[in-house]
Amino acid sequence: MAKGKDIRITVILECTSCDKKSVNKESRGISRYITQKNRHNTPSRLELRKFCPFCCKHTIHAEIKK
């Protein structure tokens, strides 16, 4: 039985370099990934290196608010 809120939550990771380029209208889009994290093990914001198809390289993807 789970007490309180669920431990595993779904989070959205967004490319940080595409986010900066979208202000200047250089990027074709913003890369986003959906994943899960354990709230007890990682209470802070999640940051992972993932492949961005718009930048054509591996960049840091950070967790965004829903």
Swiss-Prot record:
The keyword Transmembrane helix does not apply. The keyword Aminoacyl-tRNA synthetase does not apply. SUPFAM superfamilies: Zn-binding ribosomal proteins (SSF57829). It comes from the Eukaryota. InterPro entries: Ribosomal_bL33, Ribosomal_bL33_CS, Ribosomal_bL33_sf, Ribosomal_zn-bd. One of its GO terms (biological process) is translation. Gene3D superfamilies: Ribosomal protein L33. Keywords: Chloroplast, Plastid, Ribonucleoprotein, Ribosomal protein. GO terms for cellular component: chloroplast; ribonucleoprotein complex; ribosome. GO terms for molecular function: structural constituent of ribosome. PROSITE patterns: RIBOSOMAL_L33. It is found in: Plastid, Chloroplast. Belongs to the bacterial ribosomal protein bL33 family. NCBIfam families: PRK00504.1 (NF001764), PRK00595.1 (NF001860), rpmG_bact (TIGR01023). HAMAP family: Ribosomal_bL33. This is Large ribosomal subunit protein bL33c. It comes from Cicer arietinum. The gene is rpl33.
